[in-house]
Amino acid sequence: MAVVGPTAGGKSDLGIEIALALGGEVVNADSMQLYRGMDIGTAKVPEAERRGVPHHLLDVWDVTHPADVASFQADARRIIDGLLAAGRIPVLVGGSGLYVRAVLDNLAFPGTDPGVRARWEEELARVGAPALHDRLAARAPQAAAAILPSNGRRIVRALEVVELTGTFTATLPEHRSVYEVVQIGVDRPDLDQRIADRVEKMWGAGFPDEVRRLVECGLREGRTASRALGYAQVLAWFDGAMDSAEQAKLATITATRRFARRQRSWFRRDNRIAWLDQPDVTQVRRLVGSL
């Protein structure tokens, strides 16, 4: 089983319900919940609220670790294969579209070279994303055409891959499943309000203090973790780029809503996903029974 969809839709709770109903275990596919200590800002389900359901691939990386979908893919498939061999149902839960596809579909990822990546990261900081995009366009026009000039992270990755392999494909191949899987999509008409409520709850739970603690663990040096929703906005406030905690909070709400729209667009393109408008395990039971 896989439970996917935009943030704040109720995927985590539904994943636990499904695991309890089917005798399963949760496998995380939220790229930011892989980071240790990033708990409040990623809405990681506290252990006391997991209702005895084992959760895998939470708290795997330090905040200084760069995103690595290839290693995540290997780890997730190893865990899923082990659960299947033991007669347990893996329940993959997350809204990180590439990470979900990396596990479920026949995707291969080019290798990485930290030295090459660091050199292009430095160049990004020096000249900016649009100028670096021009360089990508000169070396790999088709790749550049598929990447926004403002998306520095993807531009750097594309340049790294071009340097290492001589080519880069910016689009993913067609869906080709590795597993027999039922994918449940959770979306809600009140998502904007739920996002605002979640961010308010984050601040009430001491989210800025969590960010302060993670700064001491190297959050600023983490190329991926420091850009996470909420964390980037609080760091900007700490650095004086925002005037107040309230401004950082409102910026987090806006950025999260924008991200949720992108998530929705990503997952809606996959016609293998059966969509629910509420995270209801009864609907899931009926759906599974009809397949």
Swiss-Prot record:
Assigned keywords, A-Z: ATP-binding, Magnesium, Nucleotide-binding, Transferase, tRNA processing
Lineage of source species: Bacteria, Bacillati, Actinomycetota, Actinomycetes, Frankiales
Residues annotated for substrate binding in this entry: T7, A8, G9, G10, K11, S12
Site (Interaction with substrate tRNA): S96, R117
NCBIfam families in alphabetical order: miaA
Region Interaction with substrate tRNA, annotated ranges: 30-33
Function: Catalyzes the transfer of a dimethylallyl group onto the adenine at position 37 in tRNAs that read codons beginning with uridine, leading to the formation of N6-(dimethylallyl)adenosine (i(6)A).
Pfam families linked to this entry: IPPT
Catalytic activity: adenosine(37) in tRNA + dimethylallyl diphosphate = N(6)-dimethylallyladenosine(37) in tRNA + diphosphate
Name of protein: tRNA dimethylallyltransferase
Residues annotated as binding ATP: G5, P6, T7, A8, G9, G10, K11, S12
Keyword Magnesium carried by entry: yes
Subunit details: Monomer.
Enzyme class: transferase
